[in-house]
């Protein structure tokens, strides 16, 4: 499945399954002061982000793509972000994914 489709699945799951008290997300949130990196979904006030693996993480993704993603995630950690990553397979259990994100937000 394409990354855009997976992101749509996450957004729909969040809207339908997240508790009313949970804050809304910002999509494609640019988090780095100098690089053009963006998280798929972010809650900037508490520095929690979600990345949906797809596109470059598909089986054909090469070493350069993986290294670039590692650099992005390392820089996010340096800046104090907690990044949760989900695959298409994991999104097949939306209750578990959304529950985990809500838990991360509550602990932030």
Q: What does each model-identified segment do?
A:
Residues 1-108:
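Nucleic-acid endo/exonuclease domains
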């Amino acid at each position: 499945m394409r990354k855009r489709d997976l992101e749509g699945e996450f957004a729909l799951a969040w809207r339908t399954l997240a508790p009313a008290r949970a804050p809304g997300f910002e999509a494609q949130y640019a988090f780095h002061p100098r690089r053009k990196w963006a998280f798929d979904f972010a809650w900037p006030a508490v520095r929690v982000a979600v990345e949906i693996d797809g596109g470059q993480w598909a089986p054909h993704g090469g070493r350069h793509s993986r290294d670039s993603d590692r650099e992005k995630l390392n820089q996010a950690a340096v800046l104090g972000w907690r990044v949760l990553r989900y695959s298409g397979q994991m999104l097949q259990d939306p209750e578990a994914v959304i529950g985990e994100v809500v838990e991360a937000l509550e602990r932030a």
